[in-house]
Amino acid sequence: ATIHYSTENILSETKKGPLFDPKFIFYKTEHWKLIDKKSRESFEYFIKSFKKNIEIFDTPSYFKDIHKYHQIIHETDLANNFSVYFKKFKKKLSKYMQDAITRGNKYSAKEYAEAIDFIKRSYESYQEVFEDYHGVLSPASPGVAPTGLKSTGTAEFNKVWSYLGTPCI
């Protein structure tokens, strides 16, 4: 439910605290092993501190296929959206982009359609979580972004949530 307050009452209402105790779900996915020590310690401390609001569950089995399907969609879309640039200025693209576009051009329409269809099937399986929980907690990254401009780091922790289109904090 959405509750609206006038600006004159918003501070006093905020000081009262939340209207309900939010409940979150957390999975230590297979990518948890990538997280750096400080980030792991911080996340585990946060989970322990708010244990009445956070439940830890085993990762659903179909999550393991999401990274594969996410890659098919991502690389096929890159190949489609950068096709003209790739043909004319391939050498100006990073090696990562060149490789991703090359792979994206090799996926069949069937593989792409399966990857899109798997979103719907996965979300249908997962949506019941939001009957009992308000959101998912997940590290955004394994730690601080690398120095320099060559990489922004890894998106492994966010791929599942991006693929499913679900809220994640």
Task: Report residues per predicted region.
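Acyltransferase
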Residues: 35-59, 82-88, 112, 116-133
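A short helix-breaking turn/cap at a secondary-structure junction
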Residues: 1-40
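Short glycine/threonine-rich loop-to-helix capping motif typified by GTGT followed
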Residues: 37-39, 66-76, 147-152
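Histidine- and/or cysteine-centered catalytic micro-motif in compact active-site loops
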Residues: 29-30, 59-61, 140-143
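Short, acidic Gly/Pro/Ser/Thr-rich loop/turn segments
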Residues: 31-34, 87, 144-145
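Short connector loops at secondary-structure junctions
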Residues: 53-70, 101-102
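Short helix-loop capping/hinge segments that flank enzyme active sites or metal/cofactor-binding pockets
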Residues: 18-23, 27, 69-127
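Glycine-rich, small-residue loops and helix-cap segments
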Residues: 1-2, 6, 84, 107-169
